[in-house]
From Swiss-Prot:
GO terms for molecular function: ATP binding; tRNA binding; tRNA-uridine 2-sulfurtransferase activity. PANTHER family: MITOCHONDRIAL TRNA-SPECIFIC 2-THIOURIDYLASE 1, TRNA 5-METHYLAMINOMETHYL-2-THIOURIDYLATE -METHYLTRANSFERASE. It catalyses: S-sulfanyl-L-cysteinyl-[protein] + uridine(34) in tRNA + AH2 + ATP = 2-thiouridine(34) in tRNA + L-cysteinyl-[protein] + A + AMP + diphosphate + H(+). Keywords: ATP-binding, Cytoplasm, Disulfide bond, Nucleotide-binding, RNA-binding, Transferase, tRNA processing, tRNA-binding. It is found in: Cytoplasm. This is tRNA-specific 2-thiouridylase MnmA. One of its GO terms (biological process) is tRNA wobble position uridine thiolation. ATP binds at L6, M7, S8, G9, G10, I11, D12, S13, M32, G111.
């Protein structure tokens, strides 16, 4: 079977390629060029060292449109975007997956820490958490559709990160000791400096909950719900961003406790397996990647408006971010907080 491994030049995709080759797959490395400043040279060099074929797909224009422009637009609207979710759905496992299949691959693999299985009863592919809770990336994959999951392999889903590093050492790979980047791939530093040339903004007012003006903000795109640092407001007590109103160009500030709520509404709901709907009564959900899962009741309000009622109040549910819900190790679905 021919498998195209999405190679970034990092440890995870490299070990994925080696594992699949050991398992007898015919492996080709596939790298997407999505930034002007890089062209996949590192991935090509590693593929050469592994003695596997390597191909490059230029996706700079669609990446700019689907991910970078979306990223800037969301901040302009007072939202906090989730570019990795967008990229996985539309670019990596959308256009790049299609390119791999067009090039003759039967399956596509990546170094994501997640798992996929097939349920005979429901005849559905199901997305599962990776076994390493610190590295699990299923949150970022919740929008994948059945036709995408049917073509994917995640070789690292059953391993912990340290096991992957140990395998890299065993393969004598120099990148075994490389530090992982925690940044968004197309933003080398502060996101505010990145978006500044690409968004419209003007100064406006910080208000408290009584409507009193507390100070001036630098522009809607530069703030997010729950933010405390960088407000430059003297109020004699800690204040946090409670609400962002781009239409009025105002930002509401208040105390930390006001950020907590048991009720969350979201839209653009996506089920991994449509048969799961009847099961969706009690779930565990997380409102951002780094959040702890919390028990909740899920139900539909109207059309594409969904509601989660949590047992424990959640802090700073942020419009634009993804809420993802689980049962056990299985990702049932998720949507966009509004």
């Amino acid at each position: 079977m021919k498998v195209a491994v999405l190679m970034s030049g990092g440890i995870d995709s490299t070990v994925s390629a080696l594992l699949l080759r050991e398992q007898g797959y015919e492996v080709t490395g596939l790298t997407m060029v999505h930034l002007e400043r890089e062209a996949g040279e590192k991935a090509a060099r590693i593929a050469n060292e592994l003695q596997i074929e390597h191909k490059v797909v230029d996706l700079r224009e669609p990446f700019q449109s689907a991910v970078v422009d979306y990223f800037c637009r969301e901040y302009e609207q007072g939202h906090t975007p989730n570019p990795c979710v967008k990229c996985n759905e539309e670019i990596k496992f959308g256009l790049l997956l299609k390119a791999a299949l067009d090039l003759g691959a039967d399956k596509v693999a990546s170094g994501h820490y997640a798992r996929i299985d097939y349920d005979d009863k429901s005849q559905c592919y199901r997305l599962m958490k990776g076994v390493d809770p610190r590295k699990d990336q299923s949150y970022f994959l919740y929008r994948l559709k059945q036709q995408q999951l049917s073509r994917l392999i995640f070789p690292l889903g059953g391993y912990r990160k340290e096991e992957v590093r140990e395998m890299a050492r065993r393969y004598h790979l120099q990148l075994a000791e490389e530090k992982e980047s925690q940044e968004v791939c197309f933003i080398p530093g502060d996101y505010r400096e990145f978006i500044r040339p690409h968004v419209s903004y003007k100064e406006g007012s910080f208000l408290d909950r009584t409507g009193k003006i507390l100070g001036r903000h630098r522009g809607i795109p530069f703030y997010t719900i729950g933010q405390r640092r960088g407000l430059a407001v003297s109020a004699g007590r800690p204040l946090y961003v409670l609400k962002i109103d781009p239409e009025k160009n105002q930002i509401l500030l208040g105390e930390n406790e006001v950020l907590f709520s048991k009720l969350l509404r979201f839209k653009q709901n996506h089920f991994i397996c449509s048969q799961d709907f009847e099961l969706l009564i009690k779930v565990k959900a997380k409102i951002r990647y780094a959040a702890r899962e919390s028990e909740a009741i899920l139900h539909c309000i109207e059309d594409d408006i969904w509601e989660l009622v949590f047992d424990e109040a959640q802090r700073a549910a942020t419009p634009g971010q993804s809420v993802v819900y689980y049962q056990g190790d299985y990702v049932l679905g998720g949507g966009t907080i509004y």
